[in-house]
């Protein structure tokens, strides 16, 4: 899934993301929750994205999530997501970190999850050193 994310971002002149272990674990957990027998297909499963991320130790400022089911490959899933304005915005957004999950239900249905985020800035929250995005930029992105 990382290669698909990178490919779609590169096509728009955007840099590749780095995989974050917490985002990866949370996305995999989400895919497995969605693939469980009788589970609803919703971002609210497991208490919702913010709760799942916090439970796994996420300390980031910004986060976004994509989910899908029924596609057999990551490539098909990214084509579907790129056709949806909200999912597309997450893929092409400013988050610098990512994590992906994939699970297959008992009936053979594929479930896909992507979590995107950026670590909280250091140094007082007025700008983010070390190449991090200033806090105010995340507020603008959230508000869009």
Where are these regions (language model features)?
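Short, surface-exposed glycine/acidic/tryptophan-bearing loops
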Residues: 24-72
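A short alpha-helix/helix-coil micro-patch that ends at or immediately precedes a cysteine
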Residues: 1-37
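Flexible, active-site-adjacent loop/turn segments at secondary-structure boundaries
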Residues: 17, 21, 39, 51, ...
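Disulfide-stabilized extracellular recognition modules
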Residues: 60, 68-144
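Short, solvent-exposed loop/turn elements at domain surfaces
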Residues: 11, 36, 41, 77, ...
